[in-house]
């Protein structure tokens, strides 16, 4: 019984039909726990214990042999053909152009017009929409000004998002889906004169990457 666990909403009718015609059973993503919990004694389950979530590991029955190995599909998925490599390059050139225009716009206009964490995310989206083949964001944009830049996966609340001023840092962690491929680009912009502490910490963070 071959099957996949997936959120059904991400499958088009064509993909669903092709999978079913190939004998692949489509199961709801959350059903994986019950599936593993009901594995028969003496069966085997391969999982990478370094990355599998603890909930899934915990429901494996005592009579099931766990084979601790890296997912064998990882390496083939990582191998890209020439067309894929070229498309990634094109997607990143497009995204780089949009982010560069955004960076210039922010630095020219900060302190002159009203900006906050949400409005600058919308502006970057506007620049991305100018690029041919743009589809949509590849994930929810993260724009963190000042101390908010240190919050992992920060999401600016509409009622209290920070106003940008010509000082401190703006962390921009965003991405895009283009017809050629997807991107994820993170940059930190100095919006004005920095304090001595900000300079010191920025250098300390950058040095290990050299």
Task: List each language-model region with its residue ranges.
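Active-site neighborhoods and metal-handling regions in enzymes and metal-associated proteins
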Residues: 1-210
């Amino acid at each position: 019984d071959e099957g996949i666990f997936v959120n059904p909403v991400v499958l088009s009718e064509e993909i669903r039909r092709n999978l079913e015609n190939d004998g692949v059973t489509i199961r709801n993503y959350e059903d994986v726990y019950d599936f593993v919990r009901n594995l028969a004694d003496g069966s085997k389950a391969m999982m990478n214990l370094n990355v599998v979530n603890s909930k899934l590991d915990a429901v494996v029955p005592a009579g099931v042999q766990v084979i601790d190995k890296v997912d064998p599909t990882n390496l083939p998925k990582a191998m890209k053909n020439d067309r894929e490599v070229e498309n990634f390059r094109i997607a990143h050139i497009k995204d780089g152009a949009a982010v560069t225009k955004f960076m210039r716009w922010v630095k020219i206009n900060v302190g002159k017009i009203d900006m906050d964490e949400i409005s600058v995310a919308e502006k970057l989206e506007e620049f991305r929409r100018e690029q041919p083949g743009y589809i949509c964001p590849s994930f929810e944009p993260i724009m963190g000004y000042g101390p908010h830049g240190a919050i992992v996966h920060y999401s600016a609340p509409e009622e209290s998002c920070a106003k940008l001023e010509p000082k401190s840092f703006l962390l921009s962690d965003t991405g895009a889906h283009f017809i050629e491929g997807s991107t994820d680009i993170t940059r930190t912009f100095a919006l004005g004169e920095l304090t001595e502490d900000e300079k010191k910490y920025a250098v300390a963070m950058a040095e290990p990457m050299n």
